[in-house]
Structures are given as C-alpha cells and as structure tokens.
C-alpha cells in the first residue's frame, strides 16, 4: 500500500499524461528537420530529457501553488498540500530533474535543444505560474508559450537551428492552448473561483468564454491548414485529416456557444487533446509515406 501511494503521489507531481502531449509535439520536428530518419538514440535522449524538464516544471508549479491548491476540490488532495511530500523534498527532486535534463540535452543532443527546454520551464514557472496566472484572465494566452516549445526542441535536436517551419508549429500550439484550457476552466469554474484565480470564466462569465473559445478555434484551424501550404512535404493525407478534424472542432466550439454547459465544455476539452495528438501523428506519417 505504501509503495502504491508513493508512486501515485509522484505521478501526480510530474503529470506524465500531460507531458506525453508535449512529447508528441516534438516528434514532427525530429522527422521534418532532416531527409534521413533520426536515430533511435537521439529520439530517446531528446524525449527523455524533455520529459525530465517538463516533470520538473510541474513540480515547481505545485510547490508554488500549494496554498491555492489546498482551496480547490480538484487539487486539495495533491501530495504537497496534503503534506504527503514535503516542500524541500519536492524542490530537491525538481532541481535534480532540471539539472539532469539540461546536462543530457546539452551533452547528447546540443545546447540549443537544452536551452529551448529550459526556456519552457522558466516561462511556465515564472511567467505563467508566478506572474500571470494569479493576475490576468489572459494568463493562458501569454503563459501558454511554455507548452508550445515542443516543435522548437524537435527541430533544434536534428538541425541545431529553428527554421520557419518550427515557428509555424509553435504558433499552431500557441493558438490551440487558450481554447483548450478555457474549456477546462468552464467545468472547473468554482474551483478556480475558490482559489482566487482570475480565469476567464470566473471574471468574464461562461458566455464570453465560449465566444473566445470559438475565436481561437478558428485561428488554430486556419494555422493547421496553412501548414499544408507552408511545408512542402505535406500531402493530401494531412490536408484531408486536418480539414475533417478542424471542421468537427469548429462545430463543437459553436455548439458550446449554444449550450455552454459543463458537459459540452468537457467534450470540447477532450477532443482538443485528441486533435493535437492526431495532427502531430499525421504530420509524421504523411512525411514518411
């Protein structure tokens, strides 16, 4: 039982399921940046190094937000506010993960890749968690930069450069992020209100939030389609799949305006995760065939 609790607690701290989506956004860059497929070793080190850096950022986030987490029903049982893991212990593990990640990526990949990963951590911890999240409804719009760095890491790992295609994929995720997290904020509105986080549904109301979700969904969909025209290796497979899933995502966001209920927001939230996974997988598959 103690062993099960130990692994469960650290699993909550490092959030591997969330990190898996970040890792998925790295893979297109690994394949698009070179005509030759990347080595298994390079893929493994890049993904594992990023996993460590992402895990460290989530640990630091929960150390900083421990008092607010204690006020939220969804997060009150996390290991730090419930005191199953101490602040010094979590901080030490976070620093160790961050240091090991930077070392691995610098030595076995390149310095640019390590700096991209470290920039993501710094922006998530300092820009988003400390500065923006407690202060503005636009916290996730600006602070979401941290979650967009995956494509930069992928391209940097292979080519030691950041070409325009990397920034296009960065922009796609940047436009995906607000709609995704505002949908989450709708069905967790009371929790965020209890913790005094100025999330958009709390401050502006759900109706305004659903309109903003629709707006960003359209921008995100347009960016997905534009990648077909800006990346020469993309073929009809990518275009067809993108059109289908973007149309459906647009329909879901419009339905959310008409029916701004928690269940509809949750449905959009879950589909947005599937959408981003599918887009990144499709990019790789289309490039390889």
UniProtKB/Swiss-Prot annotation:
Keywords: Cell inner membrane, Cell membrane, Heme biosynthesis, Membrane, Transferase, Transmembrane, Transmembrane helix. Carbon 2 of the heme B porphyrin ring is defined according to the Fischer nomenclature. It is a multi-pass membrane protein. PANTHER family: 4-HYDROXYBENZOATE SOLANESYLTRANSFERASE, PROTOHEME IX FARNESYLTRANSFERASE, MITOCHONDRIAL. The keyword Transferase applies. Belongs to the UbiA prenyltransferase family. Protoheme IX farnesyltransferase subfamily. GO terms for cellular component: plasma membrane. This is Protoheme IX farnesyltransferase. One of its GO terms (biological process) is heme O biosynthetic process. Converts heme B (protoheme IX) to heme O by substitution of the vinyl group on carbon 2 of heme B porphyrin ring with a hydroxyethyl farnesyl side group. The chain crosses the membrane at residues 13-33, 40-60, 85-105, 111-131, 139-159, 168-188, 212-232, 234-254, 269-289. It is an enzyme of class 2 (transferase). It is found in: Cell inner membrane. GO terms for molecular function: protoheme IX farnesyltransferase activity. It catalyses: heme b + (2E,6E)-farnesyl diphosphate + H2O = Fe(II)-heme o + diphosphate. Pathway: Porphyrin-containing compound metabolism; heme O biosynthesis; heme O from protoheme: step 1/1. The gene is ctaB. Its EC number is 2.5.1.141. HAMAP family: CyoE_CtaB. InterPro entries: Protohaem_IX_farnesylTrfase, UbiA_prenyltransferase, UbiA_sf. The keyword Disulfide bond does not apply.
């Amino acid at each position: 039982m103690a062993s099960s609790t130990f692994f469960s607690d650290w699993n909550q701290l490092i959030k591997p399921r969330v990190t898996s989506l970040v890792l998925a956004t790295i893979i297109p860059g690994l394949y698009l940046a070179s005509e030759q497929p990347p080595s298994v070793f390079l893929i493994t080190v890049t993904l594992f190094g990023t996993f460590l850096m992402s895990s460290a950022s989530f640990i630091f986030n929960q150390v900083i937000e421990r008092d607010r987490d204690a006020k939220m029903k969804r997060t009150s049982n996390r290991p730090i506010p419930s005191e199953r893991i101490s602040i010094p212990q979590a901080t030490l593990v976070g620093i160790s993960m961050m240091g090991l990640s930077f070392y691995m990526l610098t030595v076995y990949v390149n310095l640019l890749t390590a700096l991209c990963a470290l920039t993501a951590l710094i922006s998530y911890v300092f820009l988003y968690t400390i500065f923006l999240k407690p202060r503005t409804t636009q916290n996730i719009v600006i602070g979401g930069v941290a979650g967009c760095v995956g494509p930069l890491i992928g391209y940097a790992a292979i080519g030691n450069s950041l070409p325009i295609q990397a920034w296009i994929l960065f922009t796609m995720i940047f436009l995906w992020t607000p709609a995704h997290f505002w949908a989450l904020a709708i069905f967790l509105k009371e929790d965020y209100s209890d913790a005094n986080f100025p999330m958009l549904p709390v401050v502006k109301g759900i109706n305004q939030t659903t309109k903003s979700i629709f707006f960003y969904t359209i921008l995100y969909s347009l960016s997905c389609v534009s990648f077909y025209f800006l990346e020469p290796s993309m073929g009809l497979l990518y275009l067809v799949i993108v059109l289908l899933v973007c149309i459906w995502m647009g329909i879901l966001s419009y339905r959310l305006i008409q029916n701004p209920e928690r269940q509809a927001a949750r449905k959009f939230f879950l589909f947005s995760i599937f959408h981003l996974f599918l887009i990144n997988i499709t990019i790789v598959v289309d490039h390889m065939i």
